[in-house]
């Protein structure tokens, strides 16, 4: 595997995660394909398109405060111009005065476009959320 492609894909994922955690949702737009698909937990539905995708991040950032956030077990696989990145996450946040604990695995698919990795598909797997 081309290690530089792998490292650049991992860097794109870090950039996306840092931007939304810092509330800079608009910064995600250039890193997300216009027709990105996000599958909801347990595959109960999906959204398609950058506008709807970013709206979910915007809603969370406007209405929740992250108190703790951790990632581990990141795996980055690259084949040609496609990268699949997964990682476990754990987060504690407050929304509408209530404190929540959530954990699971995030799965992102990236496609190389014009020498940059662009997110094209996302699913949140094994997600568990409960009052904290």
Spans of features found by a protein language model:
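Hydrophobic/aromatic beta-strand elements that line small-molecule binding cavities or substrate pockets
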Residues: 57, 71-76, 89-91, 105-111
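Generic short beta-strand segments
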Residues: 35, 87-93, 125-126
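A short, structured loop/turn motif at beta-sheet edges
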Residues: 76-83, 110-116
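Short helix-adjacent coil turns
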Residues: 16, 20-24
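Short, cysteine-centered beta-strand-loop-beta hairpins and adjacent loop/turn segments enriched
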Residues: 91-101
